[in-house]
Regions:
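Terminal amphipathic alpha-helical/low-complexity segments used for targeting or macromolecular assembly
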Residues: 1-106, 112, 130
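Structural signal for interior beta-strand "rungs" in well-ordered beta-sheet cores
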Residues: 44, 102-145
Length: 145
């Protein structure tokens, strides 16, 4: 998930009540899972098995539950529960918005696409051209098809 605009890592640290070590003047551009991270992203790790992989990933900011050496240019955000901190950040930038109808007005449906009755299309969904969404299918918020 990309943030609407770059966010100071200090602000994120305050949000999740983290101790920051390393590059505390930088800006994060998004938050992602370990297998999807890019430069500028935040990622979390809460198991020793994945510490090295996470610290050496493309992510510039690592939410972690232990102090360790910080690679050049990166920052560690040290908290007791990294997953809880990760969820708090995601919920801040993408809070739950209840659906008020089956096909949300904020969604974009491509030319030639057909949505069958009883299909659910969530908030800010993008469906490309010439797609068929069958009955009883649910496409949740922010999905791109």
């Amino acid at each position: 998930m990309q943030f609407p605009s770059p966010v100071p890592v200090q602000w994120i640290g305050d949000l999740i009540q983290a101790k920051i070590t390393g590059n505390d003047k930088a800006y994060a551009t998004g938050i992602n899972e370990l297998h999807k991270v890019e430069a500028g992203d935040l990622v979390f790790v809460d198991h020793p098995k994945y510490y090295e992989k996470c610290i050496n990933s493309a992510a510039d900011f690592i939410i972690i539950n232990k102090e360790t050496n910080v690679p050049e240019g990166k920052a560690l955000l040290i908290v007791e529960n990294p997953f809880e901190a990760y969820c708090k950040i995601v919920n801040h930038f993408r809070p739950f918005t209840p659906a008020e109808k089956m096909i949300n007005d904020t969604s974009v449906i491509g030319e030639g696409s057909y949505i069958c009755p009883s299909a659910f299309i969530g908030n800010k969904v993008t469906i490309g051209k010439n797609c068929i969404i069958h009955p009883q299918v649910s496409i949740m918020d922010y999905c791109i098809i």
